[in-house]
Structures are given as C-alpha cells and as structure tokens.
C-alpha cells in the first residue's frame, strides 16, 4: 500500500477493565488495606483484581470484566513501541466507566507498571496528564464511545470479536490501510462478551482467529501486519 501518508488508525479499547475503585467497594477491607499500603485515598486508586478480588467477587456482578489495568498497559506499550506510533499513524482511545481516555500519538507510555497505574489514576482523577495542561498528552473526556465514533470522519470501522465473521488478518489489515481514517475496536477486558449496547450497533464484526485471544495478542498481530503493509518494514 505504501508509506501510509494521510492514514490515521485509532485503536479503541472497548469497555476497558480500567477504572477507579467504585463507590460500593470503598469501605471494603482489601480496598482499605491496599490504599494504606500505597498511601492514597481509596477513591483515587485504580481497581485491581490482584488486590481487590474478594470484594469485587462479592459486590460486583460483572467482576470478571473489571480490575485489569495491566491489559491496557501491555497493549499501549506494544502500540507505543511501534514506528507507526512515533510517525503519528496510530493513536488510542480507552473507553472507561469515567469517560474516554485519549492517548496521543508519540506519547511514551511508562514501562514500569506502577508508574503506569499512577499515571492513569492522575488522568481519571485530575482529567489529564500533566494536570491543567492546555495540550495534555493523555486526557479524559466525559463522552459516550458511540457518540464519539459518530462524530469522527471514519471510512472504516471494525469490531474484533471471536464470534464475528472469520477473515484472514492480512486482508483485514489491507482494508484498514486503504482507509484514510479507520477505527479498530478491541475488547479491553479479560473475560465475557461485549455489552448489547456495542453488539447491537451493527459494526462489522470480524474474527481473525476463531477463538478468544488476549487483547495484547490481537494488538501485536494487527499492528505487525500494518507495519508491513504500510511499508515500515
């Protein structure tokens, strides 16, 4: 396809397991304990199933889809390590329960997980990183994902889902690369299915494998093919 001039691809992590501790868990013993260890207010701390499993399992009906910040950390690390990222051809949007987190092309994602957690806590609490910046590198917008998608001049939108129509990842990536503006919707959670709100929207649903894959495995596969098609390697 060529050098990718004029191409912009947005990775959208849908229903991401990235959020602050919800109100119903703030008084839970494991939440209070982990907040004390970190020296932070529980309401300003990310929900993490590694530390908050007991209270999540007890109080959250959809606990199995929540509390996995590492999924987004690993996926963003993979994206930000790509020349497509540094050249401004790809960027990322993370759908959270607090709104949409926008990650600009070229932003360096902290390699250290604890630093990433602190960064996301800052963004979700303060609204941006750095806080108060006129041109933040990462920022939160209180907007519905579907409303955001409707506002974008997208030529192609694909929802990657193991229950979708089977398609070779190379042919899928060719369609993405041939579009000047496209969005790749990927589940940002560890288990379960997309909500009816997403599935009923009518997005083209494609499966590149036929079985469930980790979010970062999908990112790695799609991005490596795009790098080849767009002439990076």
Model-found features: residue ranges?
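Structured adenosyl-cofactor binding patch, chiefly the S-adenosyl-L-methionine
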Residues: 190-233
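RNA substrate-binding interface of SAM-dependent RNA methyltransferases
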Residues: 4-163, 227-231
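Short coil/turn segments at secondary-structure boundaries
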Residues: 24-26, 171-172, 197-199
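RNase H-like, Mg2+-dependent phosphodiesterase core
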Residues: 174-177, 217
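Adenosine-cofactor binding site in Rossmann-like domains, unifying the SAM/SAH pocket
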Residues: 167, 171, 207-210
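Short, well-ordered alpha-helix to beta-strand connector turns
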Residues: 154-155, 180, 201-203
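Long, charge-patterned amphipathic alpha-helical coiled-coil/hairpin "stalk" segments used as oligomerization
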Residues: 161-170, 180-193
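Eukaryotic short linear interaction motifs
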Residues: 19-21, 101, 166-168, 192-194, ...
